[in-house]
């Protein structure tokens, strides 16, 4: 390819955002795992305002007990608890704090995983022992 020509663009579906993946997981869980309470920990909340305002907001959240790196979803059922860190399928980065927190949770005997799709979340919850009422259609 001559140096002055632009590179050809790859075609394909856009990569879903982390929020889109998480919402799809929650929709699946309402059908397949209705007896599981799933709570979102807003550690990755989008803060507004200037850098100073965001710094103050983050300080307030930490003062209220927010832990840096805590997983996105806490899943609770009658006989168990599991934690999911949600990432987009491609171009996602797991921070050192997130890895450390997942390691800490699993060292306490709880199930924790990074999930990048509805399929991964379903398989993880099922393997963790969450009561499942429906499998995913193939």
Feature roles, as predicted:
Residues 1-138:
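Catalytic phosphate/metal-binding cores of nucleic-acid and nucleotide-processing enzymes, i.e., regions
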């Amino acid at each position: 390819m001559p140096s002055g020509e632009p590179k050809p663009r790859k075609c394909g579906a856009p990569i879903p955002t982390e929020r889109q993946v998480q919402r799809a997981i929650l929709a699946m869980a309402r059908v397949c795992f209705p007896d599981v309470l799933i709570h979102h920990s807003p550690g990755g909340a989008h803060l507004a305002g200037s850098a100073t305002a965001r710094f103050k907001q983050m300080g307030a959240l930490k003062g209220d007990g927010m832990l840096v790196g805590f997983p996105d979803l806490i899943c609770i059922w009658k006989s168990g608890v599991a934690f999911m860190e949600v990432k987009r399928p491609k171009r996602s980065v797991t921070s050192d704090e997130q890895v450390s927190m997942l390691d800490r949770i699993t060292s306490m005997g709880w199930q924790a995983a990074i999930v990048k799709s509805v399929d991964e979340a379903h398989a993880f919850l099922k393997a963790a022992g969450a009561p499942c009422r429906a499998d995913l259609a193939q």
